[in-house]
Amino acid sequence: MSHEYDDYVSSHEKPVKAINWNSIPDEKDLEVWDRLTGNFWLPEKVPVSNDLPSWKTLTEKEKETTMRVFTGLTLLDTIQGTVGAISLLPDSQTLHEEAVYTNIAFMESVHAKSYSNIFMLSLIHI
């Protein structure tokens, strides 16, 4: 079976290979992967409503400034998730490094989504 697989891989210009997390050529890939997955969070799990009392103490100018900053951060995270991190994929040295970059791209999209939760809550309570 291994011989057939090797023949298949060598006969295709850009073969698709399965990642093997049991054999990692660059230990830095595992270190970064573990750090990224250890820091994983979802905006739905963060009780943004706990910040409402503080939000209500802000002046209108402070609220407007905060919303503008969040708008810019949403755009930045969107670009980082759909252009930035993805653009690094062709330079990946290993499949594990590719996995790290796609994880980063995913988390940037999660970050962009988190601002939507903040926007929605602030609009309801303005």
What are these regions (language model features)?
Residues 1-49, 56-58, 62, 93-99:
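Extreme N-terminal leader/anchor segments
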Residues 96-118:
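Amphipathic alpha-helical hairpins
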